[in-house]
A protein has these predicted regions:
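Vicinal oxygen chelate
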Residues: 2, 48-98, 102-196
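Long C-terminal interaction/binding lobes of large macromolecular proteins
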Residues: 41
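Core segments of cupin and vicinal oxygen chelate
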Residues: 1-31, 195
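Short, charged/polar, Gly/Pro-enriched secondary-structure boundary elements
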Residues: 30-34, 96
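Residue-level detector of conserved, well-ordered beta-strand and adjacent loop positions
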Residues: 26, 37, 91
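Conserved acetyl-CoA binding element of GNAT-fold acetyltransferases
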Residues: 23, 45-46
Length: 196
């Protein structure tokens, strides 16, 4: 991606040993054109479409609610730490994940440094601390070969972002300096990474 296709890394997620768990890469002056993350694969996590303003995302939520189709909302609306984008994740009728996003940042300056997030910092997934649903790490769309047959899934054998720490699936209160337990009101229907 870097040498042959001319991509540059905008942001990545690493641990103290330098293990890369994910990287956001771009060719245009936006945060990313593609992102590579770890997990079982090959799979497509989601496809994203940009919109102009946050109110467009709220309007989508309102329309889904009015149509009694709000179950299509998987996650959000919210704001990512990585990319700073305002987002909404939906599931289409076939179960594929679709992101509608806006307001990431301009990356046209070639001297911009790579923004590196610690894998233990859960604000990387959601700036506001909203939990990430377990399906975020578990589900992805099947990749087909050139004949239209599903490509067999290969289980990940190296370090997994989800397995790195309880809470790597987006929960707050998992930074090393945070010693208190997650508040009871935040536990509910969401599961920690070790409970999936």
């Amino acid at each position: 991606y870097m040498e042959d296709l001319g991509f540059r890394i905008t942001e990545d997620i690493r641990d103290e040993q330098g293990t890369v768990y994910a990287a956001w890469m771009r060719r245009k002056p936006t945060v990313h054109d593609t992102a590579m993350t770890g997990g079982d694969g090959p799979r497509m996590h989601h496809i994203a479409f940009a919109t102009h303003e946050k109110h467009n995302i709220i309007a989508i939520c309102d329309k889904l609610g009015a149509l009694r189709e709000s179950d299509a909302i998987e996650r959000g609306p919210g704001r990512h730490g990585v990319s700073n984008a305002y987002y909404l994740y939906l599931r289409d009728p076939d179960g594929h994940r679709v992101e509608i996003y806006t307001q990431d940042y301009y990356t046209g300056d070639p001297d911009n440094p790579v923004v590196t997030w610690d894998v233990h910092d859960n604000q990387r997934r959601d700036w506001w601390g909203t939990p990430v649903v377990p399906s975020w790490y578990r589900d992805g769309s099947t990749v087909l070969d050139l004949d239209g047959n599903p490509v067999p899934l290969v289980e990940r054998t190296d370090e997994s972002e989800m397995a790195q720490t309880i809470g790597a699936d987006g929960f707050s209160y998992t930074r090393k300096e945070d010693s208190e337990e997650m508040p009871e009101w935040k536990q509910g229907e969401f599961k920690l990474g070790n409970q999936l």
